[in-house]
Curated annotation (Swiss-Prot):
Self-association and partners: Homodimer.
Family: Belongs to the triosephosphate isomerase family.
UniProt name for this protein: Triosephosphate isomerase
UniProt xrefs under PROSITE patterns: TIM_1 (PS00171), TIM_2 (PS51440)
Active site: H95, E167
Catalytic activity as recorded in UniProt: D-glyceraldehyde 3-phosphate = dihydroxyacetone phosphate
Species of provenance: Erwinia tasmaniensis (strain DSM 17950 / CFBP 7177 / CIP 109463 / NCPPB 4357 / Et1/99)
Keywords annotated in UniProt: Cytoplasm, Gluconeogenesis, Glycolysis, Isomerase
Main location as per UniProt: cytoplasm
Length: 255
């Protein structure tokens, strides 16, 4: 039985006041909600503050990136050991914005995946196709390639306890979203692709949907059998909007 996870990716947003106010709002909005895991990934500057603000709540701490190195002369980077030390659990890797703006390759992302696993942290591996790739009918090819960077080097066992986030690049922050049927088809493909190596592991992998998820489309998305929650961008910056998505995930999986 997979439990859904809804994770908020705050991206490059926030300040000290916002961290306190947003988390206070989440604590209120999510009171009594169960059946769905919740995590937030603030900017690294605010991880310590967020950790204290979520203390005693069901909200887990995440982060938006990690370096492949654990220490050394790597200016500006943050290591898996540092993230673990500060209390982060879910670490986003491979986000399309990192792939685009920082030219992160599939191989580099696979190395980050391995470092997180070795450190005992949970990778949230983002995969997904661009609009051009989607229009060219290459969605499955792209997703398979991005998964295979890990699968072919670390094996199916590496996906135990891991989160995959399918984020069609054309839907991120655009207001566009894949239809529930479109998203389900890709999620099923991802699960089936891993199942070729190990069906048991594939059955328990959490596969989130990301790409303009909001309180209006969440329930229909989460009703799909292979959609296990969401990686949420803009809507995660508002307590009521984010909580509505969490509640939709919890309700859908109880139905």
């Amino acid at each position: 039985m997979r439990h859904p996870l809804v994770m908020g990716n705050w991206k490059l947003n926030g300040n000290k006041q916002m961290v306190n106010e947003l988390i206070a709002g989440l604590r209120t909005e999510l009171s009594g909600v169960d059946g769905c895991g919740v995590a937030i990934a603030p900017p690294v500057m605010y991880l310590e503050q967020a950790k204290h603000a979520i203390s005693g709540s069901p909200v887990a701490l995440g982060a938006q990136n990690v370096d492949v190195n654990l220490s050394g002369a790597f200016t500006g980077e943050v290591s898996a050991d540092m993230l673990k030390d500060i209390g982060a659990q879910y670490i986003i890797i491979g986000h399309s914005e990192r792939r685009t703006w920082h030219a992160e390759s599939d191989d580099a992302i696979a190395k980050k995946f391995a470092v997180l696993k070795q450190t005992g942290l949970i990778p949230v591996l983002c995969i997904g196709e661009t609009e051009a790739e989607n229009e060219a009918g290459k969605t499955e090819e792209v997703c398979a390639r991005q998964i295979d960077a890990v699968l072919n080097t670390q094996g199916a066992d590496a996906f135990k306890g891991v989160v995959i986030a399918y984020e069609p690049v054309w839907a991120i922050g655009t207001g566009k979203s894949a239809t529930p049927a479109q998203a389900q088809a890709v999620h099923k493909f991802i699960r089936d692709h891993i199942a070729k190596k190990d069906a048991t592991v594939a059955a328990q992998v959490i596969i989130q949907y990301g790409g303009s998820v909001n309180d209006k489309n969440a329930a229909e998305l989460f009703a799909q059998p292979d959609i296990d929650g969401a990686l949420v961008g803009g809507a995660s910056l508002k307590a009521d909007a984010f909580a509505a998505i969490v509640k939709a995930a919890a309700a859908a999986k109880k139905a």
